[in-house]
Amino acid sequence: MKETDREAVATAVQRVAGMLQRPDQLDKVEQYRRREARKKASVEARLKAAIQSQLDGVRTGLSQLHNALNDVKDIQQSLADVSKDWRQSINTIESLKDVKDAVVRHSQLAAAVENLKNIFSVPEIVRETQDLIEHGELLQAHRKLMDLECSRDGLMYEQYRMDSGNTRDMTLIHSYFGSTQGLSDELAKQLWMVLQRSLVTVRRDPTLLVSVVRIIEREEKIDRRILDRKKQTGFVPPGRPKNWKEKMFTILDRTVTTRIEGTQADTRESDRMWLVRHLEIIRKYVLDDLIVAKNLLAQCFPPHYEIFRSLLRTYHQALSARMQDLAAEDLEANEIVSLLTWVLNTYTSVEMMGNAELAPEVDVALLEPLLSADVVSALLDTYMSTLTSNIIAWLRKALETDKKDWMKETEPEADQDGYYQTTLPAIVFQMFEQNLQVAAQISEDLKTKVLVLCLQQMNSFLSRYKEEAQLYRDEHLRDRQHPHCYVQYMVAVVNNCQTFKESIVSLKRKYLKHEAEEGVSLSQPSMDGVLDAIAKEGCGSLLEEVFLDLEQHLNELMTKKWLLGSNAVDIICVTVEDYFNDFAKIKKPYRKRMIAEAHRRAVQEYLRAVMQKRISFRSAEERKDGAERMVREAEQLRFLFRKLASGFGEEMDSYCDTIVAVAEVIKLTDPSLLYLEVSTLVSKYPDIRDDHIGALLAMRGDASRDMKQTIIETLEQGPAQASPDYVPIFKDIVVPSLNVAKLLK
């Protein structure tokens, strides 16, 4: 207490010090004192009230404890009295055993009396029930069946209570009601028949389906009641529990499975489209069934059955099993496509599970895949393998068909622009297009894979196409009279190359929508180079045909006959122009190159004739006439090829300038200026060789041996450098060795 007092005093001093920190606060001392007095009185009042409340609670608790003690003593006394009375009445209870047995027997007899009417009328009730079942009066039949079962179960239960070990009486009762189980089974068959046709019945006679569901629900309640009694007594009547609700769902599951499997009406042998037809029937049946189940069937079942959800799950599982069975079969490529398209796309589309009439109960995002990823992958691998083989076979067949067309006696068809073509590009890319459209139905990834496959096989196909074009040319060269339309079909082969290039670009643009996909495609071997090579060889073969016809006239050049007035160049120009009338059927990119090559080749053949030393001029007059003739003929060739190249926007005159430059060397009258003129010629045409110069000087006929030697040796000391864009023209001209040996003589 002293410690507490000291703490109180210290606290009070501290509070007073806090109140009186300024001089002006001294005037308020009395005010502070009254306020603190009021606070003290208030605290003391609250403290007294709390203590009083605690005291009242303690007083009440003590009173209740005292009453409880008195009650315990009274109960203890009562228990002692009961125990005493029980000990005194043991003998009396044992003497009442006969009374107890009589009570049990009375209970059994009362049950027998209560069911007496039913017992005597069992045969009649059985007949009535049988008739009701046969006439489809299922509710009334079930009511009578319940009466029979109730009588039987009541008697058996009383017998069980009296003497559970007496099997003889139990068997007697069971035998007497033996027809009951048969009626139950017969009724169940009728119920299952209705349930098997529930989707049809609900449209025609929904009342019948409701009756079936009511019967099943009654049986479920009876099952639950009997199972509850079993926990207390251990007694279960025969045939219980029936579990008809569980059997109902089993029947529905089996019905769905049978319905889906039964939709296959055809086989591959009877109908090539059997799978497409089978899947379409499944789609239609399942969609119709689920719509009926959602809108009609669900109204015939209690909500807690969740019949639509159950049927949806059953249909999904049955479909998954059916799709797995189909996937396990040895399917063809088109059948794999049909199956995967249906499984991956159709199933979740608005044509089936995504149908608006099934929403919102059916959410396609929550549906499990019908086929596992491994099965889908295996099917895709099989499809790609089969497709590869098919594409190779299709391309081979298309090429064989095109080769047969090359041998025809009639010209190939022309496109809308008048260019010759064959059906090969259209056939090939129509096939590619069809397969890509099919792959796109399955997935974007498969579409890309199929496109890459098509491009790969196209690359291999073009190599074979090139080989066949070469064989076609070789066969023609062995007998130039056959095939009859060789030129026209070779033109078509060249045009096909341009068509192939355009079709490849179109195919990529249509089926590659992303740069990443473009990268995948471009990683394949480029086909432009192969196609250009085929076109180049084709154009070369056509030019070879031209120059084979010109060979006789080219051999007249630089001969005595030519110098005296041969019309060889006139014939050459007419022949070239005539051929290029046919070559007008070649598409522009290749025709332009072909004209340039023909121009170069014509000039080159003309120069080759110069280098053959077929003639040696004997006088300045002859050299002048020969040179002027060369210039005129160069102009003829220039005019011809300008005419052929009109419309391409490019001049191609430089080749003919070579003939004019050579003519200038021939025409020169002062031999002392030969070195300067030849030097100019060499500077313009760096690919000219010393044997070319020797042949040219030999053709002049006035250059001495020393002059030839000096000119050739001087030029060899400082060969000219060719410009990057220079196209060699002398490089391929070979001077016969005989002439070379005579050059310096």
Curated annotation (Swiss-Prot):
Keywords: Acetylation, Cell projection, Cytoplasm, Exocytosis, Golgi apparatus, Protein transport, Transport. Belongs to the SEC6 family. The exocyst complex is composed of EXOC1, EXOC2, EXOC3, EXOC4, EXOC5, EXOC6, EXOC7 and EXOC8. Interacts with EXOC3L1. Interacts with BIRC6/bruce. Interacts with MYRIP. Interacts with SLC6A9. Its main location: cytoplasm. GO terms for biological process: exocyst localization; exocytosis; protein transport. Pfam families: Sec6 (PF06046). Component of the exocyst complex involved in the docking of exocytic vesicles with fusion sites on the plasma membrane. One of its GO terms (cellular component) is Golgi apparatus. Disulfide bonds: none annotated. This is Exocyst complex component 3. It comes from the Eukaryota. The keyword Acetylation applies. The modification N6-acetyllysine is found at residue 28. It is found in: Cytoplasm; Cytoplasm, Perinuclear region; Cell projection, Growth cone; Cell projection, Neuron projection. The lineage of its organism: Eukaryota, Metazoa, Chordata, Craniata, Vertebrata. GO terms for molecular function: SNARE binding.
